[in-house]
Amino acid sequence: SSLVIGVTSLGDIKKVGRIGVKTVAYYLVTTAFAIVIGLAIGTIMQPGVGLHMAADTAKVAAKAAPPISKVIIDIFPTNPLEAMVKANMRQIIVCSLFVGTGITVVGEKANALKHTIDGLAEVSYKIVGMIMAVAPIGVFGLITPVVASNGPAVLLPLLKVVIAVYLACLLHAVFVYGSMIKFLAGMSFIKFIKGIAPASLMAFSSCSSGGTLPLTMSCAQKLGASKEVSSFVLPLGATINMDGTAAYQGVCALFIAQLYGIDLTASQYMTIIVTGTLASIGTAGVPGAGFIMLTMILTSLGLPLEGSALIAGIDRILDMPRTSVNITGDAAVTLLVDKSEKKHAEAEAPLY
């Protein structure tokens, strides 16, 4: 409902296209940067070097990177209701874009439908606000079993991987988002971090970009983003923007290569960057999606899939920072696009 309202609020189909192009471009560029940072940290820290651990012999199902034609075809729903029941975010987004565009084209005759959808969006925001009142209890409940089930026996041998992923996510947030916010959005990075903190914490504990979306939207609007832009950019980001996950891909791909004593070539490094960026578009923002993307990259590199079984044991711990960075990136891009649109509106304003 929020995306439909976002499209109808923009009011101009050309404006929807302009914002859409800018949004996707920002998301793809930041994702590529994140993978490069992950590769750099993996190269410097070398988390797999000297780790003498037998890989789990259990078979790990290979996930080949989908061809671009399949990615495009799969985003169009054959049954919108089925897409909503199965929480297929890509198809829901496309369906919402069509509905929003249709309402905009029809105009006044569709106002009743527009108001109904707007009401649904407001109700969902209110429900999220009520949930946030007891969120600290929920956060504690979500994190406790993760810590309890991943004790020292599991964590210590892979501690270097955990540190590398957390460090890559932190560096990406500070340097990439920090530069974007300061120089392109014209905002203090400290102010931005304080404003997005509630959503980042919720994403950290829930490991779901989609589940955190209403709260992310609220935080972005409090930071100054318009409702029309945030309602369009953020739902899109929850599906295709996975910067934290991309940083994780870079670290973990190198970890597995180092674990097996395999030296990657320059072309293989480029394969990681390209495959990881494209896979982020075709993977929904749900818990564990990053692990599916990792198997795609390992398959494209010809690395042993058994190595991913080692990562699976600590994947939940690695999922927390990457999801937090994912939604932080969504908010950063929202502020950038909003700033750009405000400048565009000022440039087109008539002079008297």
Residue spans of the language-model regions?
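Juxtamembrane helix-boundary/capping and inter-helix hinge elements in multi-pass membrane proteins
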Residues: S9-K15, G50, V106-N111, G119, ...
